[in-house]
Amino acid sequence: MQKIIGRVSRRVWNLAGEVMHYRKPDLSKAGYVRAFPHQHVVETVRHQLSKSRPLSGTGVIKDDYLDVAEGIARFFAKYQRETGEIIDPIDQIEHQYSTPCFALLVALLHKHDRAPDLIGYAWNALLAASNAICHTRAAENHGDFYLFNLVQALDILQEIYPSDIRIGVAEGRIRKVIATDAYRCLLTPQRRRLDNWNVIASCGEVLREQAGLGNGGFHDRHLEQQLLHFTEDGMYVDPKSPMIYDLYSRFFLEVTLQGQYAGRHRDAINLMLERGAYMSLLMQSPAGVAPSGGEAKQHTWADIQQIPVFEIAARRCESRGDYVYAKAFKRGAHLAFASTIRWMRTSGDLHVVKNHMHPENRHGYESYSHHSQYSLLSAIMLALAADFSDESIDEGPTPCEAGSYTLDIPAFHKVIANHHGTGIVIDTKAETRYDGTGLLRVHQAGGDPILGPNDVPPADDYPMNIGVAWREFPGGDWVHLASHGQHTDIKTKLAASDSSDGIRTITMVYTIPSSGHTITERYELALTGVNVSINVDGAVDALTLTYPCHVSDGKLFPQILIEGTVLQMSIDGTMRTFSIISPGAAPLAIQGEKVAYRNGYVQCVTSTIPGRAIQYSLMEGSLSALAGFGVGRVVNQLSNNI
């Protein structure tokens, strides 16, 4: 009786927040009512792509998506209880939304004539998860994620097995779900800021209403509030602006709109999703990798979620006669898939984070990252991508391969630039618990993205961006640009960006009022790599340049050679060359022990330079032509000792 009273009291309280205290948001400054600031980039790149020469095909087809998805399904089928729940093979418990994800995954595979022997497992997962959410017993209180998966799984199974009595059982349970009991992320008098959890719950409620098993009150109210969290670029801003949860939130909305959502906010959401899809394609690196930064960075599903969103966007562009972008989105999806394959495990499942450490080590994991739920999330993204894929759309050059442009994205404190197969990501004011201010990543077509550099450790622990530190007097402490993040008074601006003579030039200016220092970085992106010049104004005795040298991902160990001010790294037939051009620079030296970071282990390589200016280059060398995508490049004859 006490439990019932408590549940009823909570329901009344939540309903008070939902209805009695609901305040209609002021949408006059929402992103969808403002102009798209990067529309000119979209148009310029369209012209660039239309003039580009054809590139060799990736060879990726939708069956490849299904092959990986099926491998994951078969792996986790071995860990299903008799009662239907999916148990994590590492922790031996049910995590979050693993069970409803598994139900949808196998249903989607069955729809594509895959894994018929697993259909019983899907029914068991559907019944177990629907029973859990109906009785507010979702695993680890993650009920917000259940209906998005369960309603779609039920729709597929009902179409294939319309007379199965289990349909009625699952329908009855889903119909009984009370949103204010089942979900954690709700509008209440105490909670006015929503996040990605509520996007997913709202999408589940849309699908439930379309299936005739619910009503639209919940999703109408919450999606209206969610419109405030989109920028004019169509990007979703989760608390603290992690890059990964922008596309994550849009993925769920994209899938939901394919289900013919006709609610009050369809046009506004659709506009945001179209802009966001363009931004994601423009932000993609020449290695097919999504931008990184912030919480949950370097998780494999960050790249996988590009695939269904790009497949949907390809169809949308094709239907409008925009064949240039339709083909670019198609190839972008394939590049994203190709970048993911390296993280497959021989057991058929995926590494959760982009390294080859054993899952038991949880290397690079967030506290909420688990092998089961994130592997199965990746699998449903791939299976849905296959569902949305139109194989009649051919590949065409992508912006990162054949375009030249710069994106200034202040909501995520990022500047991203691509120039004909060379791409960089700059964090303008980092969340230093995760990243560092300055240059985060350099990717080139045909190169190994992990050598990139691809990621950096948290600057709070190890300031190790490709960047500068200075000291004000001999023997003084080194002050790193990377450490000047959200908690400091640093001010950053993209001072200039233009393209001429085959080079894209970007100038970044960082001002630190509290110390009186101004750091100016000039980047020159060329076909062969990046040249960078740095000048530090203010009290400066000497500079140190730091470089995060990747030393292991748990499986592959690059060969590393340092000769004076030149660092060469090679792995799997590709080579990276980092060299300091400034005269008077001390020889490069490895500092300290290796440091754990998301991609494995990294060591800091440094050089000290007298004065206040420094210049360096980062170039891609290729020891052998790469199969697959992109353009392999041989810069010159590199050391035979590598």
Give the location of each predicted region.
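Surface-exposed polar/charged interaction patches
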Residues: 7, 11, 15-18, 22, ...
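Generic recognition of long tandem-repeat/solenoid scaffolds
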Residues: 236, 415-419, 503-511, 567-569, ...
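Acidic Ser/Thr/Pro-rich low-complexity disordered segments
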Residues: 45-57, 449-459, 627-629
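Short amphipathic alpha-helical coiled-coil/interface segments
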Residues: 126, 174-178, 273-280, 329, ...
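Extended polysaccharide-engagement surfaces of secreted carbohydrate-active enzymes
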Residues: 282-587
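Aromatic-lined, polymer-binding surfaces characteristic
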Residues: 77-272, 284-308
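Beta-strand-rich recognition/accessory modules
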Residues: 579-642
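Low-complexity, Ser/Thr/Pro/Gly-enriched N-terminal "stalk/linker" regions
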Residues: 4-123
